[in-house]
Amino acid sequence: MEVTAKLRGAAISAQKVRLVADEVRGKSIERALDILAFSNKKGAVFVKKCLESAIANAEHNHGLDIDTLKVSTIYVDEGITLKRILPRAKGRADRISKRTCHITVKVGE
């Protein structure tokens, strides 16, 4: 049985989070949490939050034993992009894209 958790609208680009997601895919829960705890990437915070939510869902909603769980699927989709303006000299302006992402984690036995 697979249990899902989603984190939508995380304020980080999907490209940065995918670097972290690739490291924990297929690992056991304990190993994945260790990797995320000692990672110096900003995306590790978001992935860890979503993974802990999936673990809590498995334990509370489905009564699964968390010692036997592993990260079966993890993927990161692009969210909405917020367009912002940065004023520059002589009346000009630059466009800033603030990217977001949606993180989906599935844990199973």
Swiss-Prot record:
Pfam families in the record: Ribosomal_L22
Keywords (A to Z) from UniProt: Ribonucleoprotein, Ribosomal protein, RNA-binding, rRNA-binding
Xref: InterPro entries: Ribosomal_uL22, Ribosomal_uL22_bac/chlpt-type, Ribosomal_uL22_bac/org-type, Ribosomal_uL22_CS, Ribosomal_uL22_sf
Subunit structure as annotated in this protein's UniProt entry: Part of the 50S ribosomal subunit.
UniProt superkingdom: Bacteria
UniProt entry tagged with the keyword rRNA-binding: yes
A biological-process GO annotation: translation
GO MF term set: rRNA binding; structural constituent of ribosome
Annotated GO CC locations: cytosolic large ribosomal subunit
Function: This protein binds specifically to 23S rRNA; its binding is stimulated by other ribosomal proteins, e.g. L4, L17, and L20. It is important during the early stages of 50S assembly. It makes multiple contacts with different domains of the 23S rRNA in the assembled 50S subunit and ribosome. The globular domain of the protein is located near the polypeptide exit tunnel on the outside of the subunit, while an extended beta-hairpin is found that lines the wall of the exit tunnel in the center of the 70S ribosome.
NCBIfam families: rplV_bact
Homology family: Belongs to the universal ribosomal protein uL22 family.
Signal peptide limits: none
Protein's name according to its UniProt entry: Large ribosomal subunit protein uL22
Taxonomy of the source species: Bacteria, Pseudomonadati, Pseudomonadota, Gammaproteobacteria, Moraxellales
